[in-house]
Amino acid sequence: MADSSYCFPVSDNELVLRLRTAKNDIKDVSVLYESKYIIGGCQKKQNMEKQFSDSLYDYYVTKLLLTDTRVGYVFYINDGKDKYYYSEDGLTETYDFKQGFYNFFQYPYINPVDVMSKVDWMGKACFYQIFVDRFKQGIAHKGISYINCEWGDIPSPFTHAGGDLKGITEKLDYIKSLGCNVIYLTPVFKSKSNHKYDISDYYEIDEQFGTNEDLHELVETAHGKNMKIVLDAVFNHCSEDIMQFRDVCEKGKNSKYYNWFIIHGDSVNADRDNYEIFGGCKYMPKWNTGNESAAEYLINIAVHYLKAYDIDGWRLDVSDEVSHAFWREFRKAVKKCRKDAIILGENWHNAYSNLRGDQFDGIMNYSFTKACLDYFAYDKFTAGKFSDRLNEILMRNTDIVNYMTVSYTHLRAHET
């Protein structure tokens, strides 16, 4: 149970324990604990509180304040008739603490470096998401021949309404007046589409949105108003037009970038679908983040915008399809550059494997979104069922993710 959502440190001497039981099955629960080196001779006892319930389970929770963080522990469960000990041996009517070194639960040692860090400003963050093309046109004299979408038209990926970064800068006071203090922008880099998730140059702002200097101006002006800017990192895939993929298309295995992508064969053959892509989009080849050179290239992009543009963090597109190893290196580089830069993953499902402190600070909370839609919009839930669903979502993650760093909890986003 150590290093799980049922046993985790929240500081260098505080350990949170949770126990899940069948709903309404248990009268009370306590935990018997001590340093794992002396628990055989003496134990401390601390009651656990039933803090959450969902449709199937009750969740008992307690926080241990420790002087020795090398902890062994056993649960003591009272169901109203019988009493049991719960250890790695399962439920037993008796427990021999003197022989418990083999089977008590443990948190071996709280290494301070392993305690998930907090991004303090996220606790008071209210986000305003902007799909840049659809927001506001602020560059009065730019070429507009590409604009082929009127307000209210049904869009496609290649219809353009003309929004740009200048338009956002002009509306910062309006956004702040709504109570928002963080702006999350969908991708702004060079791309054929309106959504810009098919990036062909990560170092160039798309000309439809303005210039690199316009991004500088937006971030600087926002910071002057105590607002923050978070950009969208598309590191799962790119555009077929990016230089590296074009080189592979031309040279096949002779390209130095061949292993930057995942290609099944000696050369790219779009007709045979022989390379990995995002979704069903042939024009978005998937990066091979397991390749050291490709990973270094992408991580350097993230660091560049933190240093050169002073952005406040990254939202990670399709983050659950990218390797854990890549995200660990990504986090090291980002946090070395700026400890308070936020890292938010686009994970639609249970994301605990990314939220253990070595990868993301939080996620875009689509499970919360779905629960709210089912209750408020579609009338699928009773209030009790809605509460059950929210409690189940909370119990997926640690307290730092739920309360201290806070995920991006939204009712709608550009994908929903």
Predicted regions and their residues:
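Aromatic/hydrophobic beta-strand junction motif of beta-rich domains
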Residues: 17-21
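Beta-strand-rich binding/interaction modules
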Residues: 26-36
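Substrate-binding/active-site clefts of carbohydrate-active enzymes
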Residues: 125-127, 131-181, 188-309, 330-336, ...
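Hydrophobic faces of well-ordered beta-strands that scaffold small-molecule active sites
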Residues: 126-128, 183, 229-231, 314, ...
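Active-site-proximal helices and loops of the catalytic beta/alpha 8
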Residues: 219, 223, 245-249, 303, ...
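Conserved small/polar residues in nucleotide/adenosyl-binding loops
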Residues: 409-416
